[in-house]
Regions:
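Extreme N-terminal leader/targeting segments of oxidoreductases
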Residues: 1-26, 44
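N-terminal Rossmann-like FAD-binding beta1-loop-alpha1 element of flavoenzymes
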Residues: 26-51
């Protein structure tokens, strides 16, 4: 089992991993989105954090699932001209999940606050996906887009040698067997040879020697 002490603090808070110690304030098991968020928040509060991962690379399921999050009525929706409200979300969740009302209300009350905190205290940046319907678009309270947020691509070379520690996306999300692409690149790649704009976009992707995730 591999472990990285304060790994999230290094990447997100600009700190270097601390030496292994005998005691920690917070121990996080798993390096997916939930684990990394927990570690980053604890580190931002000056807690000594140990992040433990059983795999040889970090990222968990999040790394192979696109890294998107579902945050209803988020403050970023206005960037793409969309609007939402918690009452509509509440109706949608009441028709789709069987979780307790208490947990649902906690999610509704704090999910947007959570992403605000992460963007303020870490280098994570998210953007709304305008056309990404809820899984059950015909149910009451569903929307056709905006609730899903995706991470803004960044230059993977900033991680240096630690880039190799990241779990790779699925092959379907990579070009030429190893070049990572974003969701917005896919329509352009499908139109190569049919659209000058898309062809130029694809050529820039290939010519770009940066690693991006």
């Amino acid at each position: 089992m591999d472990s990285w002490s304060d790994y999230s603090a290094k990447r997100w808070l600009g700190l270097r991993p601390a030496p292994m110690r005998d005691r920690y304030d917070v121990i996080v098991v798993g390096s997916g989105a939930a684990g990394l968020c927990a570690a980053a928040v604890a580190a931002s509060q000056s807690q000594a954090v140990l992040l433990v991962e059983s795999a040889s690379q970090i990222g968990g399921t999040t790394a192979i699932s696109g890294g998107m999050v579902w945050v209803p009525a988020n403050h970023k929706m206005k960037e793409v001209g969309l609007d939402d409200n918690l009452e509509a979300t509440r109706r949608y969740l009441q028709h789709t999940v069987t979780d307790s009302d208490e947990r649902m209300e906690a999610f509704l009350a704090t999910s947007d606050e959570a992403i605000r905190y992460l963007e303020q205290h870490t280098s994570l940046k998210l953007r709304p996906v305008k056309r990404y319907p809820d899984y059950y678009p015909d149910l009451p309270g569903a929307t056709l887009g905006g609730r899903v947020l995706e991470p803004v691509p960044f230059d993977g070379s900033e991680l240096g040698a630690d880039f190799s520690r990241l779990r790779w996306p699925l092959p379907e999300f990579m070009l030429f067997g190893g070049m990572m692409i974003s969701r917005e690149d896919i329509p352009h790649l499908r139109r190569v040879g049919q659209s000058l704009q898309s062809t130029m976009h694809a050529l820039k992707l290939v010519a770009n020697t940066r690693n991006s995730v």
